[in-house]
Amino acid sequence: WNEELAEKKAAYVDRRHFNPDFVNPCRFVQTLSSKMNDDAIYVADVGQNQLWSADNYVMKHGRFLTTGGFGTMGYSIPAAIGVRAALPDTQIVAVCGDGSFQMSLMELATMRQWTLPIKFVIMRNGYLGLVREYQHHTYHDRYSGVSLDGSPDFEKVADAYGLDYFHLEHNDEME
């Protein structure tokens, strides 16, 4: 049944429409998965990024880690650190939204203290995106508590922890 599911996923056409002025998150996850090692561990945080990851990540022989439907925002950083400690020779990539990342970014200090190389992808949209999407559909665009105005400059956060940083702005920069 694994082969059957793989065939269905390969034939799946994502019909969602995204603003062409921004990076298409589904295409990004597909491209990212094609660049990852065969045995890589992909850690998906909670939110829209989790949905895009579940729909578009193509796993080879590694693992896909997520909290499922438990809604534990901030999961990806400590989970990735734990996986890195357990599997020091395996590529680890953690994908999260800007809200989730901020919920446990202090754990970057732990990562640096123990010299644990992990790649983080922050899908930044300036909102608690999945909560905002729910409020859009359920409360007819009456939003409350979803804006992330005042978020830090993530390049400066990376610099403060001695981490490399790259900002992807357009779809043609993915390769």
Where does each model-flagged region fall?
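Fold-independent oxyanion-binding glycine-rich loops
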Residues: 1, 32, 45-47, 67-69, ...
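Active-site diphosphate/adenylate-binding microenvironment
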Residues: 4-83, 89
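General structural feature for long, well-ordered alpha-helical segments within catalytic domains
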Residues: 24-28, 38, 49, 104-107, ...
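Short gly/pro/ser/thr-enriched loop/turn and capping motifs at secondary-structure boundaries
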Residues: 50-51, 71-73, 101-102, 126-130
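Short glycine/serine/threonine-rich phosphate/pyrophosphate-binding segments
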Residues: 75-77, 100-107
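A short, small-residue-rich loop immediately preceding and capping a beta-strand
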Residues: 89-103, 118-123
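Thiamine diphosphate
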Residues: 113-175
